[in-house]
Amino acid sequence: MAAYEKAHIDEVASNQWPHWIPVRHHFGIETFGINLWRGRDDGTVIPEHDHGEDGEPELYYTVDGHATFTIEGEEVDAPAGTCIWVSEAGATRAATAREPGTLVLSVGAGPPGTGYAPAGWDSHYLEGDK
């Protein structure tokens, strides 16, 4: 077995959810959360959500294109190359694409002082891909 695995994002993309690229699930990563998100036709990149229940902070990185994040009602401009760290797990956040081809990487961590625990929501959404 090789010491690494590799995959192109088009190989990782969900058939049922083409805007979501389930990187963590694809590689079986259990120590942190990681996904890629493509802008949808309606401009949505990442739907509004928070992590108040699981306490997990998140880092977002705009890989390509241009996104606008809305965090606790405040709009944050995020052109390609921008990192946004949402340290307050309960803060609502969402991202929209300002241009076609926008791609955002999200990385989730466990609450401070704990390890990461996969929430399982990604497996639920992937059931239709089998």
Residue ranges and their predicted role:
Residues M1-A3, H8, T96-K130:
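Double-stranded beta-helix
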Residues M1-E48, H124-K130:
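A short, N-terminal "cap"/entry segment at the start of jelly-roll beta-barrel domains
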Residues L36, V63-D64, I71-G73, E88, ...:
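Residue-level recognition of conserved beta-strand positions in structured domain cores
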Residues H49-E53, T92-R93:
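Histidine-centered active-site/metal-ligand motif
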Residues G52-F69:
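Short, conserved beta-strand element in jelly-roll/cupin
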Residues H66-T68, T92, G101:
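Structural motif
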Residues E72-G90:
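Short acidic-glycine-tyrosine-enriched beta hairpin
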